């Protein structure tokens, strides 16, 4: 059973690593994620990761309580580095060679982000974890994922969430919400479906970088997705919109 993709970028939210109360780092979750990543790596797939920091700090929340927005965002970037190190440790305990590259220079614990070096790591089948966001305030880690995926030539972005795709409405609030199996970037933006921020979606749209939104918490989903099973919601430049059950 081979992979549909040669090189992928997995976007993980901070909550994928969160402990009780959606805060901190749960090492069991980190090791579970590392096992899922190893299964895909064993298929010969080159893997890059971008991880958020919301389980530790959300810059936008700090800005709301009076901290300067740029300062708050820098604090959030540092949180992503903590998560990246936790994920690196978990992956290496599974025997995976891993490199953390940070957009913010922090040389004693991570490489500085250099595109050509990142590509070389991927070619050598090392896991590359991109941390520190874009290195600039006001940009989300979703935008980081879009930017890095385009820069290092990934085939697809796999956006790992706690829901099994993109819905017509919030399924927690609307029992009639339907899941899209496929939707275009433009429709996602126009309908304000909150898949990613508009900057991230626009970057993917302009560079023809498909996104698949899926549930990372269901064991085996990542491998099934990479091997071609129809899981989650595909967002692409195709204007064909498909809704489950229709």
Curated annotation (Swiss-Prot):
GO terms for cellular component: cytoplasm. Its main location: cytoplasm. Gene3D superfamilies: Acetylglutamate kinase-like. It is an enzyme of class 2 (transferase). Transmembrane segments: none annotated. It comes from the Bacteria. GO terms for molecular function: ATP binding; UMP kinase activity. ATP binds at residues 11-14, 54, 58, 161, 167, 170. It is found in: Cytoplasm. One of its GO terms (biological process) is 'de novo' CTP biosynthetic process. It holds the Pfam family AA_kinase. Keywords: ATP-binding, Cytoplasm, Kinase, Nucleotide-binding, Pyrimidine biosynthesis, Transferase. Its EC number is 2.7.4.22. UMP binds at residues 53, 73, 134-141. Pathway: Pyrimidine metabolism; CTP biosynthesis via de novo pathway; UDP from UMP (UMPK route): step 1/1. Inhibited by UTP. It catalyses: UMP + ATP = UDP + ADP. InterPro entries: AceGlu_kinase-like_sf (IPR036393), Asp/Glu/Uridylate_kinase (IPR001048), Uridylate_kinase (IPR011817), Uridylate_kinase_bac (IPR015963). SUPFAM superfamilies: Carbamate kinase-like. Catalyzes the reversible phosphorylation of UMP to UDP. Homohexamer. Belongs to the UMP kinase family. This is Uridylate kinase. The gene is pyrH.
